[in-house]
């Protein structure tokens, strides 16, 4: 899927990314085992492995300056974005959540390149304020409130703040039709990934 989405990616680049990801997945599992009694969120909140690889590969290949994700939980997706940007030698991760007890698996060193924005009421106004403060965004990831109205709001607001090369990613697009409807409104064809339990979506920049 990654190679077909990014035809300019060489076989050697993809193989290198796969090797990096395998090592990082093992490190993440070790951390989770060691911290199992201190993590705030259950395992099923975590990003699934194929989706995690997609996110890591997109970040490694596109080398974004700014990534924004919504929904953090224990910090699995945050971990992969931060590790990808460390390899890239550039980039900052901004995460949006409604709670501050998130990202527990991240080390102090990883938190240096990570900014957590806790939404205040009214949440839509607070979300727009975050977007305005960090745009343009090169990668946007939705993984927060999986209701049609909120997802559509996030997608549309994020699109307005994205750079010309921006990639939009979304977890749990099988919860409702918001992602498909959003892409249809733009007359664009999304890329879908069926993982173990759910479906993730990706919308690439228009060529």
Language-model-detected regions and their locations in the chain:
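A short alpha-helical cap/connector motif
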Residues: 1-141, 145-207
């Amino acid at each position: 899927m990654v190679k077909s989405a990014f035809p300019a990616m060489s076989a050697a680049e993809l193989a290198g990314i796969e090797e990096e990801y395998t090592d990082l997945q093992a490190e993440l599992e070790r951390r989770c085992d060691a911290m199992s009694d201190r993590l705030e969120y259950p395992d099923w909140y975590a990003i699934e492995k194929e989706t995690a690889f997609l996110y890591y590969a997109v970040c490694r290949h596109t080398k974004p300056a700014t990534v924004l994700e919504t929904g953090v939980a224990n910090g699995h997706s945050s971990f992969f974005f931060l590790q990808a940007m460390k390899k890239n030698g550039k980039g900052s991760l901004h995460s949006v959540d409604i709670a501050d007890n998130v990202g527990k698996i991240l080390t102090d060193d990883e938190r240096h390149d990570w900014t957590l924005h806790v939404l205040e009421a009214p949440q839509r106004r607070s979300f727009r304020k975050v977007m305005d403060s960090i745009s343009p965004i090169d990668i946007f990831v939705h993984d927060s409130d999986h209701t049609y109205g909120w997802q559509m709001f996030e997608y549309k607001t994020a699109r307005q703040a994205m750079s010309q090369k921006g990639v939009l990613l979304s977890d749990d697009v099988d919860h409702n039709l918001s992602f498909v409807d959003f892409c249809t409104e733009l007359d664009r064809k999304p890329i879908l990934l069926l993982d173990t339990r759910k479906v993730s979506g990706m919308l690439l920049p228009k060529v």
